Amino acid sequence: MIYGIGTDIVSIERIEHILNKNMQGLVNRILTDHEKALFANKGNSPAFCAKRFAAKEAFAKALGTGIGKVVSFLDLTVRNNEDGKPYFIPSEKLRLYLLEKGITKAHLSISDEKHNAVAFVILEVNQETN
């Protein structure tokens, strides 16, 4: 059963502008250590950063809380499986919150084109929970 749906779109140019002004500030605010290593390996790609930003915003929207008190950018790591499919790894604090809400699964789709990055998230709960 669907708990929530979230989507976010972000201008890659906007992220690039912020990275040019204050790369460390933005990177430290939105990327986990694992993501920082990937970001560096990808030549500090604005598209990489924009996709992670959009994914985390979409997750927070699906959760219904937005980024803030319940979930921060650093509470979520976006990884890819061996086939390239993206998925989330929540922090322990967020994992416990999701368990409390009965949320058992998060589906993530991320895409980018020349100017924009977009992410779509569906959160699921068990039928018995709701």
Label every PLM stretch briefly.
Residues M1-N130:
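Core catalytic alpha/beta fold that binds nucleotide/phospho-ligands
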